Amino acid sequence: MLYLLIGLVAGVAHAAPTGQAYMSIIIDDLGQSPERDSRTLALPGPVTMAIMPDTPHATDFARQAHKAGKTVILHMPMDPATGPYAWHPGVPLAELARRLDAALAKVPYAAGVNNHMGSRMTAQRDAMTWLMGELQRRDLFFVDSRTSAATVAAAQAQAQGTANVSRDVFLDDERTPEAITRQLHQGIALARKQGSAVLIGHPYPQTLEVLERELPTLARQGVKLINLQQMIAERSNLAMPAHGKQGRYSNR
């Protein structure tokens, strides 16, 4: 399997930083606005495009992003999100599978999946176990957006050997340039401390303004922007300290 790199050994902690700090950035909620999508696509470096399947420009933008050399992922709606593709607790697995198939068909070239909302759904152990097995079968990775402390998604991915990473920092819960800049700097500090950081933002004008200004400065600050496939290899499917102990995700 392309991303299945890991045979976890009990008690092995995540690798200590070796001097190089790595960062991956995901922009969620794409496919809604050609103007915002194009501005996001123009961000420098390997920024990941997370595209919602139930948006008017999902398929066209996925093709455009792939052609531009960006990593494309499916931004999968999960409860409390609504719509024809959304996953909800209590929906039979056969219907969840149908919705996943339909969503992936709307976002060609998807290399992986992350959850849109999903605070209730990512806590559903049976559904997450099935999803991680299905993603592994399809040679896709999973990004746990960690919209809930009760998530078991990354733990189930790790248990099954499905390639995955988890979000460390949300950039734009507060939509001001000052707050977004602080969050980005928090991500930089975290990358330096633990060797890597995964950040998620949205195509808000304020977020794009900050990233357009700050991304060209990352290298001077000792941080290398890498794509998610490289981040998965760098982290070797291990949990960061905020998400588990000794490299193991908390499995609530």
What are these regions (language model features)?
Residues 2-5, 11-252:
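Catalytic-site microenvironment of enzymes
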